[in-house]
């Protein structure tokens, strides 16, 4: 489990990378399921599969072809894979997230896979997670488990250390929730990022307010992340869950307090995308406001 210096670093910098959180066998089980979904994607030319809110479970990039698959998102893999369910609800990932959140306990909010297969165009613009998942307090941790090796070259997460202590920026542009900060904010605050990478089985724990982004993968090697978001058990969610799941709200650490804790934050509630993922939202191609 985490030592105090790691917990202190997380709260000071807004992120923490820990190697060897999962065993090789645990990672191999996750990789096997994901590889099967990539193979399945070769027979599709549009997002497919069903989730509990009616949107597609599997999302593909515009450059996807049978010969060059570009599966970029699997929503709520915990619902279709025992390996992913165990990882999100019972593994050291959840326990460490609980340590970082502190307080009485922690719940799973949602989970997803974000993938960048070799030479694919998937990128993520600068944003904070909290505007997507606002709660009564901001004790939320985004846990990015590296299923594949993540290197400085294959599109790693980039973060701005300490930005979780600063402004909660608007992610609205031209009356639409686009899911990224305005260009002038990026220019002023996002010029000296730090890349987060490590061998498979590593986890980057990230505060929900931390500014982050990532670039396309232009290498021969995949970059696959299983992302689980955990919230303090006394954090009441505001608005719709963008990725609702059968496992949303599951207590993974600690106990119930029966309380709701509030901290002062001001933001406009997000629009929930109609498309398969927030990638279409960031690209301005979602039909939510049309």
Residue ranges of predicted features:
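Active-site region of the double-stranded beta-helix
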Residues: 103-106, 130-135, 147-156, 162-164
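Double-stranded beta-helix
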Residues: 8, 150-211
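Non-heme Fe(II)/2-oxoglutarate
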Residues: 40-44, 48, 62-63, 203, ...
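Short edge-strand/loop segments of extracellular domains
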Residues: 118, 160-167, 229-235
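Glycine-rich phosphate/pyrophosphate-binding beta-alpha loops
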Residues: 129-131, 140, 208, 213-217
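Non-heme Fe(II)-dependent double-stranded beta-helix
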Residues: 1-12, 19-126, 132, 241, ...
């Amino acid at each position: 489990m985490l030592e105090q210096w790691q917990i202190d670093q997380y709260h000071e910098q807004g992120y923490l990378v820990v190697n060897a959180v999962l065993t090789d066998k645990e990672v191999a089980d996750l990789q096997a399921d994901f590889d099967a979904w990539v193979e399945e994607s070769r027979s599709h030319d549009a997002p497919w599969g069903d989730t509990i809110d009616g949107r597609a479970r599997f999302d593909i990039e515009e450059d996807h072809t049978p010969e060059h698959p570009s599966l970029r998102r699997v929503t709520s893999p915990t619902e279709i894979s025992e390996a992913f369910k165990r990882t999100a609800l019972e593994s050291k990932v959840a326990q460490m997230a609980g340590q970082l959140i502190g307080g009485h306990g922690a719940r799973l909010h949602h989970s997803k896979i974000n993938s960048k297969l070799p030479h694919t165009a998937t990128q993520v613009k600068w944003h904070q997670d909290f505007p997507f998942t606002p709660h009564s307090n901001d004790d939320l941790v985004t846990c990015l488990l590296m299923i594949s090796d993540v290197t400085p070259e294959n599109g790693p997460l980039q973060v701005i250390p300490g930005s979780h202590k600063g402004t909660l920026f608007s992610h609205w542009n031209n009356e639409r929730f686009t899911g990224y900060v305005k260009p002038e904010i990026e220019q002023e605050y996002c010029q000296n990022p730090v890349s987060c990478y490590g061998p498979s089985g590593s986890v980057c724990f990230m505060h929900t307010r931390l500014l982050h982004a990532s670039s396309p993968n232009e290498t021969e090697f995949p970059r696959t992340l299983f992302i689980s978001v955990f919230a303090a058990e006394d954090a009441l969610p505001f608005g719709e869950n963008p990725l609702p799941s059968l496992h949303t709200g599951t207590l993974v650490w600690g106990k119930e307090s029966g309380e709701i804790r509030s901290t002062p934050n001001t933001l406009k509630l997000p629009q929930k995308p109609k498309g398969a993922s927030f990638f279409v939202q960031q690209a301005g191609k979602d039909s939510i406001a049309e």
